Amino acid sequence: MILAEGVQKFSLFFLEGAVLVGALGVVLLPNILYSAFLLGGVLMSIAGIYLLLNADFVAAAQVLIYVGAINVLILFAIMLVNKNDGRVAAGTSNSSGVTNNIIGLTCIGLAGFLIDMIVTTPWLPKGVAVATSLSAKADSTAAQTQLKGSISIIGLHIFSDFLLPFEVISLLLLVTLVGAIVIARRERLSDLEISKISLLNLPDPSNGKTPSLK
């Protein structure tokens, strides 16, 4: 995408801020349905960043696959499993503190692993360098063309050099879907238990007394 330098910087900062705020909302909001909608906004913002990087195919794949398929699947799972508004009921969690600590450490480890991979990955192919003199302008243009690549080159790199991060992201999306179903299912079971207790506490119409739960 060809834009003025100032517009590019502003758009990049805006999209990065949208990704950060949306990601925090996905994690912190108590309503899982709102979190799913914010997840769609995060994925759309990432697609916008791809457009700024002239990765049109990757941006289109991001919208079609992640927003149009995976995020919609998560929304369907939430709305079909959970009959209420998706709010996590307080005090219904049976997870122990040890389990929560393990989950937190696992998330921190995955985040550190991805950050280390981003920092240490050689994003430029070997032998391709940025030209810094007028005599190297032709080589720089050829390198730029080579870096744009084609669909076949993208597929080759995804399933060779970047296979591990690709599978890690797929695993994270699977965990997100399973977690959404578990949270929604847990609240539904809690509501059923409350309904059963309410039925047991209904007064007996014959004598007007409340039956005992013993």
From Swiss-Prot:
Q: Does the keyword Transmembrane apply?
A: yes
User: Reaction catalysed by this chain?
Assistant: a plastoquinone + NADH + (n+1) H(+)(in) = a plastoquinol + NAD(+) + n H(+)(out); a plastoquinone + NADPH + (n+1) H(+)(in) = a plastoquinol + NADP(+) + n H(+)(out)
Question: What does the UniProt entry say about where the protein is found?
Answer: Plastid, Chloroplast thylakoid membrane
Regarding the membrane, this protein is recorded as: Multi-pass membrane protein
Q: Extract the signal peptide range.
A: none
Keywords assigned: Chloroplast, Membrane, NAD, NADP, Plastid, Plastoquinone, Quinone, Thylakoid, Translocase, Transmembrane, Transmembrane helix, Transport
Note whether Transmembrane helix occurs among the keywords.
yes
Q: What do the Gene Ontology cellular component annotations say?
A: chloroplast thylakoid membrane
Molecular function, one GO term: quinone binding
EC number(s) on file: 7.1.1.-
Query: Which parts pass through the membrane?
Result: 10-30, 32-52, 61-81, 102-122, 163-183
| Gene3D superfamilies (UniProt xref) | NADH-ubiquinone/plastoquinone oxidoreductase chain 6, subunit NuoJ (1.20.120.1200)
The enzyme's main class, written as a single word, is translocase
Q: Which InterPro entries match?
A: NADH_UbQ/plastoQ_OxRdtase_su6, Nuo/plastoQ_OxRdtase_6_NuoJ
Cite the record's note on assembly. NDH is composed of at least 16 different subunits, 5 of which are encoded in the nucleus.
Q: Any idea what job this protein has?
A: NDH shuttles electrons from NAD(P)H:plastoquinone, via FMN and iron-sulfur (Fe-S) centers, to quinones in the photosynthetic chain and possibly in a chloroplast respiratory chain. The immediate electron acceptor for the enzyme in this species is believed to be plastoquinone. Couples the redox reaction to proton translocation, and thus conserves the redox energy in a proton gradient.
Which family, according to the similarity comment? Belongs to the complex I subunit 6 family.
Q: Can you say what this protein is called?
A: NAD(P)H-quinone oxidoreductase subunit 6, chloroplastic
Q: Which organism is it from?
A: Chlorokybus atmophyticus (Soil alga)
